[in-house]
């Protein structure tokens, strides 16, 4: 409860007329004053209805004031009573009066003693009331804190139970992942890891693919070759030439014989062709000559037979020469040329053979590429599967290590929990029916905690739990104050940094007005600096003049005492009026004494 609320409650107890309309927050500032706080605490704890003057006495006092009669205070009333007693009491009763005075003094002392005791009791009562109020407030705060802590513990317990249940479910799920299935159907129904997958179908497909690839290779690279060779008798020699490209040495002689047979057939056919062409050419030439000379023969039929015979003999001789020349060409030159041309026959044959080999090689390379692609795919699938198994094995090993470390930590925590339980089951730590206020000497943990929180290493005879609680509260308050100070310092630091950044930005903008060039001085600043220089020169000149005037006035004051007195009076007039009045009074007295003399 705040101080303002306690003050308002006290006023309401004293039956203040407008106490219900007051707000305690409006009076909190009164308790911040150091001088007023003790009085206000005493007033809130000790004031009661007995300290309030009743309305009847107030009304009688007000009527006495309004009547105009004088109201004497305590001292004046005592003096009046003394004079009254002196004037009225006879001298015979002086002894009795002295006794009465002694009794009065004794009673006064007793009264003072009772008053002091009453004040002490009131102070004790006020302290007890204050302690009661504090204890009630503390009890309420403790109850609220207990409820909050209880609620927090319940929420924490629920969260902990939920987390533990989720951990148990997760562990069960994890154990179901790593558990060995009893049947293959259970494994194939819900595969979790790669190692749990059945690879029979995949391996059977790979075996079928490998068998198909093997049969394809045998058919197209081994068995298909013999079928292609045995398929036709006409292409036997060409295929034998192609087979030689694979490195078979048995068909080399057959190839040479075949080439010689082809060359010989080519030579014979070429020789016959040339002879036939020569005969046909001779026949064509004879026919053409006969056609051309038929008219001439008819015209010259009448010529002499002698000229004809001579002509016939000359023609026969020419014919014989031509035949001899033709025979020499056909027997000597033509066979050599035909043999040379027969050798040129090998070029298209060899070219065709090489073309066939190139086509076969291209076909084989394409088939080999297909086979290689299939093998590479198969190898890649196997390597990918192997990599997946290796990664899964590595993950399983990591999980195994982590589970081992978790099991070890759980064992250690279980051992520590057992140690704590055995420690807490100690008889000395059990709560007694009457809680102890002092800390037991065997409770070393509480003593060490007290030393740690208090920071005092001195040996104390008794240490209480209340002191430990107060030290802990003080530590928490210090921590809260330090956190508040840190927050305030961080805010001030951030504010200073922001101001510094803004000032730096302004300075940068001011020093770099055009972006890149540094401006040490601006025209405005240079003009102001020149103006300040001129003003400083004027000020210096004025200062020199003032110093000259001061020196001159000092010389005048030193030489003239009247001016010194005048100066002193001016100083007193502005600084010390009392001194001026005393001096003026002295002067007036002197002038008055001189005039009377």
UniProtKB/Swiss-Prot annotation:
InterPro entries per record: HAUS3, HAUS3_N
Coiled-coil stretches noted in the UniProt entry, renumbered to this chain: 91-123, 290-319, 392-428, 463-494
Keyword field contains Cytoplasm: yes
Subcellular location: Cytoplasm, Cytoskeleton, Microtubule organizing center, Centrosome; Cytoplasm, Cytoskeleton, Spindle
Biological-process GO terms, alphabetical: cell division; centrosome cycle; microtubule organizing center organization; spindle assembly
A Pfam family assignment: HAUS-augmin3
The organism's place on the tree of life at top rank: Eukaryota
The entry's keywords: Cell cycle, Cell division, Coiled coil, Cytoplasm, Cytoskeleton, Microtubule, Mitosis
Keyword Cell cycle: yes
A GO CC term assigned to this protein in UniProt: microtubule organizing center
Family: Belongs to the HAUS3 family.
Its job: Contributes to mitotic spindle assembly, maintenance of centrosome integrity and completion of cytokinesis as part of the HAUS augmin-like complex.
SUBUNIT field: Component of the HAUS augmin-like complex. The complex interacts with the gamma-tubulin ring complex and this interaction is required for spindle assembly.
Protein's UniProt name: HAUS augmin-like complex subunit 3
Species assigned in the record: Xenopus laevis
Lineage: Eukaryota, Metazoa, Chordata, Craniata, Vertebrata
């Amino acid at each position: 409860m705040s101080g303002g609320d306690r003050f308002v409650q006290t006023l309401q107890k004293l039956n203040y007329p407008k106490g219900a309309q007051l707000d305690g927050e409006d009076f909190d500032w009164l308790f911040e004053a150091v001088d007023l706080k003790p009085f206000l605490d005493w007033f809130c704890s000790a004031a009661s209805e007995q300290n309030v003057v009743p309305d009847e006495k107030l009304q009688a006092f007000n009527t006495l004031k309004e009547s105009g009669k004088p109201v004497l205070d305590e001292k004046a009333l005592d003096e009046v009573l003394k004079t009254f007693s002196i004037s009225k009491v006879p001298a015979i009763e002086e002894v009795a009066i002295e006794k009465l005075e002694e009794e009065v003094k004794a009673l006064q002392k007793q009264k003072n003693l009772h008053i002091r005791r009453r004040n002490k009791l009131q102070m004790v009562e006020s302290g007890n009331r204050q302690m009661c109020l504090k204890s009630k407030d503390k009890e309420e705060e403790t109850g609220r804190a207990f409820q909050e802590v209880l609620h927090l513990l319940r929420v924490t317990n629920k969260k902990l139970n939920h987390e533990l249940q989720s951990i148990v479910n997760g562990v069960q799920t994890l154990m179901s992942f790593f558990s060995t299935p009893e049947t293959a159907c259970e494994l194939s129904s819900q595969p979790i890891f790669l190692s749990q997958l059945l690879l029979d179908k995949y391996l059977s497909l790979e075996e079928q693919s490998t068998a198909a690839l093997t049969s394809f290779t045998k058919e197209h690279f081994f068995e298909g070759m013999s079928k292609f060779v045995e398929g036709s008798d006409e292409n036997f020699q060409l295929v034998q030439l192609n087979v030689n490209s694979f490195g078979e040495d048995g068909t080399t002689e057959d190839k040479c014989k075949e080439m010689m047979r082809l060359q010989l057939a080519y030579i014979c056919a070429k020789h016959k062709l040339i002879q036939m062409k020569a005969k046909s050419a001779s026949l064509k030439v004879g026919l053409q000559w006969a056609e051309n000379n038929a008219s001439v023969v008819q015209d010259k039929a009448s010529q002499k037979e002698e000229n004809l015979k001579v002509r016939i003999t000359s023609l026969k001789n020419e014919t014989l020469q031509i035949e001899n020349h033709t025979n020499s060409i056909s027997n000597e030159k033509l066979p050599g040329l035909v043999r040379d041309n027969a050798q040129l026959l090998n070029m298209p044959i060899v070219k065709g053979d090489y073309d066939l080999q190139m086509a076969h090689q291209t076909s084989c390379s394409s088939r080999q590429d297909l086979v290689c692609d299939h093998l590479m795919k198969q190898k890649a699938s196997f390597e990918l599967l192997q990599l997946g198994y290796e990664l899964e094995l590595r993950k399983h090993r990591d999980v195994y290590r982590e589970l081992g470390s978790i099991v070890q930590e759980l064992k250690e925590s279980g051992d520590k929990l057992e140690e704590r339980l055995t420690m807490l089951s100690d008889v000395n730590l059990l709560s007694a029916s009457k809680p102890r206020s002092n800390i037991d000497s065997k409770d070393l943990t509480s003593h060490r905690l007290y030393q740690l929180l208090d920071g005092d290493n001195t040996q104390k005879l008794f240490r209480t739990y209340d002191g430990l609680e107060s030290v802990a509260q003080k530590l928490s308050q210090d921590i809260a104050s330090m956190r508040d100070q840190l927050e305030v310092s961080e805010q001030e630091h951030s504010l200073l940094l922001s101001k510094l950044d803004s000032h730096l930005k302004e300075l940068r903008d001011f020093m770099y007005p055009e972006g890149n060039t540094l401006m040490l001085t601006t025209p405005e600043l240079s003009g102001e600096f020149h103006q300040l220089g001129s003003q400083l020169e004027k000020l210096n000149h004025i200062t020199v003049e003032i110093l000259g005037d001061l020196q001159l006035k000092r010389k005048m004051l030193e030489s003239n005492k009247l001016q010194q007195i005048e100066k002193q009076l001016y100083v007193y007039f502005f600084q010390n009026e009392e001194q001026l009045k005393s001096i003026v009074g002295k002067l007036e007295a002197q002038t008055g004494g001189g005039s009377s003399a």
